[in-house]
Each structure stands twice: as structure tokens, then as C-alpha cells.
Amino acid sequence: MIELRHLTKTYGEAPHTTTVLDRLDLTVPAGSITAVVGPSGAGKSTLAQCVTLLTRPTSGSVVVSGQDLTQLGAGRLREARRRIGTIFQSDGLQTRRTAAQNVELPLRYLGVVPRDRTRRVAELLDRVGLAGLADRYPHELSGGQRQRVGIARALALRPGVLLSDEATSGLDPQATASITGLLRELRDDLGLAILFITHEMDTVVDVADAVARLEHGRIVEAAPLLDVLRDPASPVGAALLPRRGVGDAGGLVVWEVHYRGDDVPADWLSAASRELGHDLALLGASVGTVAGRTVGHATLGVPAALDPTLLTAALDRRGLHAQTSPSTVPSPRELDLV
């Protein structure tokens, strides 16, 4: 688990200080992936450096597996860092070493005996799908394959957490999908707590269990990913699964409906309309993939006379989650447009 408590980082001397991280709180449980998103200058890179204490926070704590790294001396901090695997946009591979030799480096530095190193490297390359490429040099590998070598190296010392800082930036869509798929496997198989820092919103829906939005050094939104997608007021949800094609509600009450496409019957709208005895108007819809699962969003226009409890019950029985939109959309006549 990763726990960041009131994490603050400032530069300069008072009164001319610049605050890059401002009392930031974030928890990444074991066996989960939390994505941190935000514009350039939001503080994402500084956050990554503070998690590993490559940059020491001005105040606050960085707790990894129950241990506050900010309270450790140099020797114990080196030991604690072994529990944090890191992967970056640059794979950082040594060009004159093979894939196997690159993965072996942390084991060699730690003094692991050769026989155990060989066995561990073979396990790791197999884990990341590169068992047949152990003797290849970095220039003989694709960008996605090099990043997989970097992941194998990050796992060499059996960390409990993994920090991914823009690790998929610059990769083509196929390579990106393979890396996010691998991270999900590592989450499930090894129970890792993964902090996934990125500016690529399309990647978030493929990998994250939760998402936090960072702006000006502060977390302004943080929630499980599906909750973010269900929130019509969420800027992150709107960016990840846009509400496309919303039409006129004609004086109807607007409802937002969310669902996992694989669990919902194709005729849910017509079936619910027949059951309720009211026509439900489809104003807009979109479908996407979130962490490997199909999810959808629909905007409905619902007659004001319809009992909301009956509507939610009818949709719940079909595997849909519904909530009213913040306001009722007036008809064109009410707006004096006709």
C-alpha cells in the first residue's frame, strides 16, 4: 500500500516560495491501480520523485507498506526503496547489455549468487512475455518490448508497490495496450499497489481502478473509476467517456444512466419503457472500455409524471445505474425558440 499524507513540496525561501505539491492526500491499496492525471505543470513529476524520496518533501509523509520513508535514515531508506519498483517513459536500459543482463543488474548489485540470479531473471522474463528474447540487445527490441524489460527489472527485488511515471508515453497504441494489460496482470497476480502517473486519458480507462486529478499541486478529484464515469459533473468522467449526441429533452426530466455493456440486455430501453408504461427518450449515448470491461453511458429524457423509484427499480433489474441530472432541460417552446 502507498499512503501519501498531507504531502507538500515547496521551493525557494519565504516570502518567495513556490508550492508544487499542496497538502496532498492519496491512498493506493494493495492489489489496485490508481491513475494520477493532470495537465503539464500540475505536479505529477514532482509527485513521482517524492514517492521514492528522490526529492524530499517539505512536509507530510510517504508511507509504503506501513513504513514512513520520510522518517528513515540513509541506510534504511536504501533498503525501503527496494520495495518500490519504478518504470519511466525512458526505459533506461543499458545498450551494451542484453535484456537478461539488464534485468539482472539489481540482483547483481544486491549480491545475489549467480545461480539464483539466472533463475530469477528467467522467471521475470517469462512473467513479462519475453522468455525467448533474453539474449537480445535493446536496439533489437521494439519500444513495447524494451518497456517490458524495464518492468521485469523493476520487479527483480520483489517490490510491494510499482510506480509508473508516463511509462506508456511515446508507445504506439498496440504497445500501450500490451503494457496496460501486463500491469493489470501484475496487479492481480502479485497484489501490487500501482501508482500510474500519466497525461494520456485514453490509457486511464484501460488500466485504472481509481483515478485522481491533480491541478496546481492539489488533488481536486479522486474516486473509483466507475464512480467518476457515473458522475455527470466530473471533468475526468467527461474526458474519459464523453456524453456525445445529447439532444433536446422537450421538457422531460434528464436522467444519467451507466452500465456495463456485457451485463445489460440489448433491449433494455424498450423493455423498461413497456414495463413502466412510459416512453423513455434516448437523448445520447456512448460506449467505451474501462480496464478491459465494456461500459456505457446514456442520457434519458423521462416524463415528469413517472415515479423515480419505479424507474430506478426497472433499470436496476436490467443491470443499469441511474441518477437524475443536475437540472431539467426545458423544451424549445419554454426557451421561446419556437
Write out the residue ranges for each language-model feature.
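Catalytic Walker B motif of ABC-type/P-loop ATPase nucleotide-binding domains
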Residues: 162-165
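The feature captures the beta-strand-to-loop junction immediately N-terminal to the Walker
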Residues: 37-39
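Helix-to-loop junction immediately C-terminal to a conserved catalytic motif
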Residues: 52
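Conserved signature/switch motifs of ABC ATPase nucleotide-binding domains
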Residues: 136-139, 157
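ABC ATPase NBD coupling module
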Residues: 15-18, 69-85, 109-114, 228-232
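Conserved ABC ATPase "signature" region
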Residues: 68, 104, 108, 115-132
